[in-house]
């Protein structure tokens, strides 16, 4: 059983005050009652932070936004949940930062120079998606069973599944149609008699790996579109490759070429520690590429 300690609502809001600040790290004095890896809101602008250390009378929080202007005595509010991301149709064709804040939508509301404390939903909660329900009343479902299929793009069908740690009998299903990511699709009766409403959305802690039923062996080659790599250094689908090299030897450019031309259905580009001009190139060029399939 996977314990995610995700709470739909928190009955008692826990708060604390800032005792000290050191760059992106803040310190809270006393017994705060906060949990390790818990998401918190810091200061008047409600900057996003995460509890990274707990001592007897000192709580350490890392803030994921600029801390300039914060001062001791400002309030820190606990959410009762770990730092999590929203998994649902609409993730594809988006640009997110490391905690799934949608940078394009933030730029629309706050401008190109993103200000602190901007709160925007990660995904569009008003868009309706054509949905095909794959279960019926009376079915007994386990974690990972598919309850609905949503064509997210012309090439990718998003399969909505029962969340990990959940199983039960289907009480209610909706008819095929168009629904938002928060609309009820299936209602389950759990073994303890409670009910659980399932939507297209799952909230998942960023530090908890997604569970797998089993892994397939890496036996099919990944055609990268780069002849020297496909001939001399073949990569397997499901495998891992590394590009070592010194400064200016073309590591990033090779990565860009593989991302552009590899025989893959979905490309997830993660830029960590990249130069600003290289990320700009990714955003400009990748957005103009057309999948010939």
Protein language model regions, located:
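Short, compositionally biased
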Residues: 53-59, 89-100, 156-177, 196-210
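Short histidine-centered loop motifs in beta-beta connectors
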Residues: 63, 68, 130-140, 170-179
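ATP-binding Walker
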Residues: 249
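P-loop (Walker A) phosphate-binding loop of NTP-binding proteins
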Residues: 246
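P-loop NTPase nucleotide-binding/switch module
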Residues: 108-165, 180-240, 254-257, 292-293
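N-terminal accessory targeting/assembly segments
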Residues: 1-115
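Conserved P-loop
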Residues: 252-293
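Hydrophobic anchor at the beta1->P-loop junction of P-loop NTPases
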Residues: 243
């Amino acid at each position: 059983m996977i314990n995610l300690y995700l709470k739909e609502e928190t009955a008692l809001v826990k708060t604390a005050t800032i005792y000290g600040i050191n760059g992106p790290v803040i310190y809270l004095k006393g017994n705060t009652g906060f949990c390790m890896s818990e998401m918190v809101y810091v200061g008047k602008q409600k900057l996003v932070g995460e509890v990274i250390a707990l001592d007897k009378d000192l709580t350490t929080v890392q803030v994921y936004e600029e801390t300039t202007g914060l001062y001791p005595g400002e309030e820190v509010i606990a959410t009762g949940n770990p730092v999590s991301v929203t998994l649902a149709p609409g993730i594809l064709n988006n640009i997110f930062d490391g905690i799934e804040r949608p940078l394009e939508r933030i730029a629309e509301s706050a401008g190109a120079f993103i200000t602190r404390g901007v709160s925007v939903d990660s995904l569009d909660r008003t868009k309706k998606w054509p949905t095909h329900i794959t279960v019926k009343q009376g079915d007994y479902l386990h974690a990972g069973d598919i309850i609905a299929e949503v064509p997210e793009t012309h090439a990718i069908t998003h399969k909505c599944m029962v969340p990990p740690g959940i199983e039960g009998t289907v009480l209610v299903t909706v008819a095929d149609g168009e629904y938002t990511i928060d609309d009820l699709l299936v209602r389950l009766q759990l073994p303890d008699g409670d009910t659980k409403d399932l939507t297209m959305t799952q909230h998942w802690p960023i530090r908890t790996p997604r569970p797998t039923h089993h892994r397939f062996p890496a036996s099919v080659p990944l055609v990268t579109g780069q002849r020297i790599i496909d001939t001399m250094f073949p990569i397997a689908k499901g495998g891992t490759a590394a590009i070592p090299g010194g400064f200016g030897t073309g590591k990033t450019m090779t990565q860009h070429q593989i991302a552009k031309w590899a025989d893959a259905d979905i490309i997830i580009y993660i830029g960590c520690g990249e130069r600003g001009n290289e990320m700009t190139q990714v955003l400009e060029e990748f957005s103009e590429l057309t999948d010939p399939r």
